[in-house]
Regions:
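C-terminal catalytic "cap/lid" subdomain
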Residues: 1-289
Length: 289
């Protein structure tokens, strides 16, 4: 048995460095790819990937299999099981990853976790039946609004260009144009940890952007539903919006990808929204504890 240290690597100029958050998982996947292992088992503090956080929804179900793409989306929008880099590497190198619990005793119970695989191992029939795979939430969001930005070519580039140069990741974007004033309000979200740098960058560029006021709100949360099944099914977003509206939960922003729909809501309504959507998409386990 080879024991190999993880969480470290070399920079482009051959200096030893650490890999940052999720570095151990990334190391494990990289080694598995290098030795062409059949599977990479990652032991962590949870026993698999669930349809959502079981602490919020006790009826959440553990998933037997998840596609790379779904796991990548779930990890990027708040699921804490694996970091995006390890999942992305597994997807690139086609390494099957199994998430297992460090606390399970294999001599007493059969080892059961979640297997992260390619679409070909899931099967079209299974993907058709399973519209939504999981629901994730992320409270580490900040909403920024710039009011009365001149409605002219290049105005948006003056906002997001400097943010990109500062390596600040922008997620949801909304632009509301007031035709009678020739100006627009631009709202977007950034990671909460990047809010201070975002404000500093925008204040330095105020003259170039031409906005009137900068407002921000950290009491927001992003809720995301993820599933490869939505590629072939209509009405996923409609179900989400209707379920939230019926419980009086207001949507502040929306973003979508091929297999994901995300909404921004008040932070205080996070747990309620997750529970409502988990039920709306039929994800509740039948044998609830």
């Amino acid at each position: 048995v080879a024991v190999i240290p993880g969480f470290q690597g070399l920079t482009s100029d051959d200096r030893i460095t650490t890999l940052g958050r999720g570095g151990s998982d990334t190391s494990a996947v990289a080694v598995a790819a290098a030795v062409k292992a059949d599977r990479c088992d990652i032991y962590t503090d949870v026993d698999g990937v669930y349809t959502t956080d079981p602490r919020i929804v006790p009826r959440a179900r553990k998933l037997a299999k998840v596609t790379y793409e779904e796991m990548l989306e779930l990890a990027s929008v708040g699921a804490k099981v694996l970091q995006t880099r390890s999942v992305g590497l597994a997807m690139k190198e086609n390494v099957r990853v199994q998430v297992l619990s460090s606390f399970d005793d294999p001599t007493e119970n059969p080892i059961t976790g979640t297997l992260i695989v390619g679409d070909d191992e899931i099967g079209e029939d299974e993907m058709e039946r399973q519209l939504i795979t999981g629901i994730a939430h992320d409270k580490n969001e900040a909403k920024v609004t710039l009011t009365r930005v001149p409605d002219r070519p290049g105005a948006v580039a003056n906002i997001f260009g400097p943010l990109a140069e500062a390596n600040i990741n922008v997620d949801m974007i909304i632009q509301n144009i007031a035709h009678d004033t020739g100006s627009t309000d631009v709202t977007f979200t950034v990671p909460g940890a990047e809010l201070a740098r975002t404000i500093d960058t925008l204040e330095k560029g105020k003259d170039a952007i031409g906005y009137q006021e900068l407002m921000h709100d950290t009491k927001v949360s992003k809720i995301s539903v993820v599933g490869v099944g939505m590629r072939s099914h209509a009405g996923v977003a409609s179900t989400m919006f209707k379920a939230l509206a019926q419980r009086g939960i207001n949507i502040q922003a929306i973003s979508t990808s091929e297999i994901k729909v995300s909404v921004l809501i008040d932070e205080d309504e996070t747990e309620l929204a997750v529970r409502v959507l988990h039920t709306a998409y039929g994800l509740d386990a039948e044998d609830a504890a």
